[in-house]
Amino acid sequence: MVNGEAEAECTRASLLGRYEIGRTLGEGNFGKVKYARHLATGAHFAIKILDRNKILSLRFDDQIRREIGTLKLLKHPNVVRLHEVAASKTKIYMVLEYVNGGELFDKIAVKGKLSEHEGRRLFQQLIDAVSYCHDKGVYHRDLKPENVLVDRRGNIKISDFGLSALPQHLGNDGLLHTTCGSPNYIAPEVLQNRGYDGSLSDIWSCGVILYVMLVGYLPFDDRNLVVLYQKIFKGDTQIPKWLSPSARDLLRRILEPNPMKRINIAGIKEHEWFQKDYTPVVPYDDDDDNYLDSVLPIKEQIDEAKQEKPTHINAFQLIGMASALDLSGFFEEEDASQRKIRFTSTHSPKDLFDKIENVVTEMGFQVQRGNSKLKVMKNGRGSKNLRNPSSFLVCTEVVELGPSLYVVELKKSHGDPILYRQLCERLSDELGVCKTEQIQRTESLEDDLESFDSGSSLPGF
């Protein structure tokens, strides 16, 4: 182990000795991104310097490995390039392509919307890059304008592959089963808590990006997350009539809520709107990056840490990596400070409320039931005042997303968090929602947010 650490320190010294490190480009929960210049060639790079202890403590080692492993596979002009990786005892260094034009999000925010000509050019690059990734067996799963960078020539670069899926993540049915993505860009089938085709869900996200580029605002948006899910699930959006007929047709075919009817990559490339002035991008040659073959000599340390530390997700990770929220297989945490949890279900509202009422009654809670809401209460020490410190109140609501699909929301107004956890565990057992370890995530989020408020800086990447 000592020899490995010494070798890692030499690797780090060798790497940093080849670069002149400059200003900070960004800061986050894992470390910083620094501007760097290669001393021998003068080429510009961005070096992501990550704190290994934080990665281990926040249980993000798998996500960092996934990002590195994915970027090793991808060598395309419209994908951010990973050039070099090194690790010391305390840090991980990722030397990335420097993209100096900012995010596509900023470009749209400044202009309001893009012309069809400019939007088409960028969309062609986006589809070329996504098609290339899919051919490599990589599904991004978090495509959005914030994860699409623009270089000084105005060309795009897809970034942030921390949530990407590789072929080994597919289930026996050939489908993905882990829900990732940002709410406004997530495909409706991903919300259904079933397996989904990663290529078709990426296409949906590309369609939302195209809509934003051409129209200037989101096709699906609402401050209420449940209402937003309803709109996405139903494909409830209006395509402006001032767009060209062919642009409107392509948007309609991409934003088709039924993935079996949605246009695929090949269909997009053959579409008349896409074909105009289209020149396919040629991927880079598969030149060897030999220094990537010895990436991260940290597996032994990570495996040891896994045996010592329980699985959980805390507030620092939540704020810094909000896109990693699981929106279906587990309670989706919108605002931990409000103790709100949600899950999807195919049970009817009546069945859901009947089961919830049976469980909470057995646990000694009182119930008030309405048409689409149910209150779970317990008075403290015989007091009729529900604001008594020892009292407990949880409000439950069921909202229809679509045919035979509902969102159940539980919101703890006040009360003992341990009692709330016990309630969640009982409900999860009865409804078959999630595993105990996932319930623990909710509890740790709640506790960590309270300690987080006392003094940490806001992460940014």
From Swiss-Prot:
Residues 160-189 are annotated as: Activation loop. ATP binds at L25, G26, E27, G28, N29, F30, G31, K32, V33, K48. Residues 338-367 are annotated as: PPI. Its cofactor is Mn(2+). InterPro entries: Kinase-like_dom_sf (IPR011009), NAF/FISL_domain (IPR018451), NAF_dom (IPR004041), Prot_kinase_dom (IPR000719), Protein_kinase_ATP_BS (IPR017441), Ser/Thr_kinase_AS (IPR008271). It catalyses: L-seryl-[protein] + ATP = O-phospho-L-seryl-[protein] + ADP + H(+); L-threonyl-[protein] + ATP = O-phospho-L-threonyl-[protein] + ADP + H(+). Residues 19-274 form the Protein kinase domain. The active site is at D142 (proton acceptor). Induction: By drought and cold stresses and abscisic acid (ABA). SUPFAM superfamilies: Protein kinase-like (PK-like) (SSF56112). Keywords: ATP-binding, Kinase, Manganese, Nucleotide-binding, Serine/threonine-protein kinase, Transferase. It comes from the Eukaryota. SMART domains: S_TKc. Its EC number is 2.7.11.1. CIPK serine-threonine protein kinases interact with CBL proteins. Binding of a CBL protein to the regulatory NAF domain of CIPK protein lead to the activation of the kinase in a calcium-dependent manner. Belongs to the protein kinase superfamily. CAMK Ser/Thr protein kinase family. SNF1 subfamily. This is CBL-interacting protein kinase 1.
